[in-house]
C-alpha cells in the first residue's frame, strides 16, 4: 500500500478546482515528544487518506504541525480520530475564517527534524515551558497597556498585508532569523510585558518558550493566533485591533480580516494586498500583484518571466535545468526583477 501521493500535482489541482463537495480548512499543532516519528507518520497518513484529508502535515520529535482541508461531512469523524490519539485529545482546531474549500489539493505527511525550524542548538531549552496564553479580550487589554510590547512573530511578507496596531514587525525572511532579531531588540526590556502573536500560534508558542528560557518574566502569546482572534472578536463583538489580511500558507494565500488594504502592488505601487506566485515554473516567486498587472504580465513577476512563459514548453523546461533557485523561496517580495520593488530599492 502506497504511503504517499503519486498523482500529478497539476491534475490534482484541477480536480480540486472543479470539485463541488464542501470542505473545511483546519490547522492545528502540538508540541509533544514523539519517539517513533516514522510509525506515527505512517499511521496518520493511512487514517487521513481514508478520511479524504488534503494538506500538509509535519511530524518531528518535538511534535506535529498540520494545515489541512477536510470534507465538511467528515469533520466530526476526523475530530473523533484525532482526539483518540492520547497527546492530541482536545487539541485546538483552528477553522479558517475566510474559506472557499480550495486550500489544498493533495496530502503530504512528512517527517522533519523540527516542526518549526529555529536554528537553536541549546539542549537545555524546553519548548513546552511556554508563555501564558491569552484570548482576544485579554490580548486587547494587554495591548492597551503602555508597559506592553507587541511583537509579530511572522515573516515580512506576512505582516506586509496585515498586522496588529502598534506591533513591532521585524523585517525578516525566516523564523530562525526572527528569534535572534527579537532577542536583540528586547534584551533590555525583560521586565515589560512581551505580547507575541502569529498566524495560528505555533511560532509564538516556541518563541515565547525561548524568551522565558532567556529570562524574560512576563511573556504572553495570543491563543490560537490571528485565526482564533478574528473568530472571537466577531462572535463576541470585541474591538478588532488587527488590520488588513491574514496571510496563510495554502492556495488561498490570505484571509480577509478587515477591509483595510495596507500594502501595494509590487509592480505598479497601486494599493493591493493579493499575493500571487509567478506563473513562470522556473521562478514561482511570491509577490503582491493587482488585477491590472496580472493581465499585463500574464501572472508573472517581471517582463523577463513573461517572455519565458511565452516560449514553447520544451524550451522552458530546458531553461529551468540551468536554474539553481537555491533558497529563492525566502526572497518573497524582495526580488529586484519586480518593477516597483526595483524602483523602491533605488530611491530608498
Question: At which residue positions do the language-model features occur?
Answer:
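Structured helix-beta-strand junction loops
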Residues: 51, 145-146
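Internal catalytic-core helix/loop-beta-alpha segment
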Residues: 131-145
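Rhodanese-like catalytic fold shared by cysteine-dependent sulfurtransferases
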Residues: 2-132, 155-193, 202-348
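Short hydrophobic beta-strand that contains or immediately precedes a catalytic carboxylate
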Residues: 149-153
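Substrate-contacting helices/loops that form the catalytic groove of nucleic-acid
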Residues: 199
Amino acid at each position: 500500500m502506497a504511503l504517499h501521493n503519486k498523482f500529478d500535482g497539476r491534475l490534482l489541482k484541477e480536480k480540486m478546482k472543479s470539485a463541488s463537495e464542501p470542505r473545511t480548512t483546519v490547522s492545528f499543532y502540538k508540541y509533544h515528544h514523539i519517539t517513533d516519528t516514522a510509525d506515527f507518520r505512517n499511521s496518520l497518513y493511512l487514517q487521513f487518506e481514508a478520511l479524504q484529508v488534503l494538506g500538509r502535515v509535519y511530524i518531528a520529535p518535538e511534535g506535529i504541525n498540520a494545515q489541512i482541508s477536510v470534507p465538511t461531512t467528515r469533520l466530526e469523524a476526523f475530530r473523533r480520530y484525532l482526539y483518540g490519539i492520547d497527546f492530541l485529545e482536545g487539541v485546538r482546531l483552528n477553522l479558517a475564517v475566510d474559506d472557499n474549500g480550495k486550500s489544498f489539493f493533495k496530502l503530504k505527511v512528512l517527517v522533519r527534524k523540527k516542526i518549526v525550524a529555529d536554528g537553536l542548538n541549546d539542549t537545555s531549552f524546553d519548548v513546552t515551558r511556554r508563555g501564558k496564553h491569552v484570548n482576544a479580550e485579554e490580548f486587547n487589554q494587554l495591548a492597551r497597556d503602555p508597559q506592553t510590547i507587541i511583537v509579530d512573530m511572522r515573516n515580512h511578507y506576512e505582516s506586509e498585508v496585515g498586522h496588529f496596531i502598534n506591533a513591532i514587525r521585524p523585517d525578516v525572511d525566516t523564523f530562525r532569523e526572527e528569534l535572534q532579531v527579537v532577542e536583540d531588540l528586547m534584551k533590555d526590556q525583560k521586565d515589560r510585558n512581551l505580547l507575541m502573536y502569529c498566524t495560528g500560534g505555533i511560532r509564538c508558542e516556541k518563541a515565547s518558550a525561548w524568551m522565558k528560557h532567556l529570562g524574560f518574566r512576563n511573556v504572553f502569546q495570543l491563543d490560537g493566533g490571528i485565526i482564533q482572534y478574528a473568530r472571537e472578536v466577531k462572535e463576541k463583538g470585541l474591538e478588532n485591533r488587527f488590520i488588513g489580511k491574514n496571510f496563510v500558507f495554502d492556495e488561498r494565500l490570505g484571509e480577509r480580516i478587515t477591509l483595510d488594504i495596507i500594502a501595494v502592488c509590487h509592480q505598479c505601487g497601486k494599493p493591493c494586498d493579493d499575493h500571487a506566485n509567478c506563473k513562470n515554473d522556473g521562478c514561482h516567486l511570491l509577490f503582491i500583484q493587482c488585477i491590472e498587472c496580472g493581465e499585463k504580465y500574464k501572472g508573472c513577476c517581471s517582463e523577463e518571466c513573461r517572455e519565458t512563459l511565452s516560449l514553447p514548453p520544451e524550451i522552458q523546461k530546458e531553461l529551468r535545468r540551468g536554474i539553481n533557485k537555491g533558497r529563492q523561496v525566502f526572497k518573497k517580495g524582495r526580488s529586484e526583477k519586480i518593477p516597483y520593488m526595483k524602483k523602491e530599492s533605488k530611491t530608498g
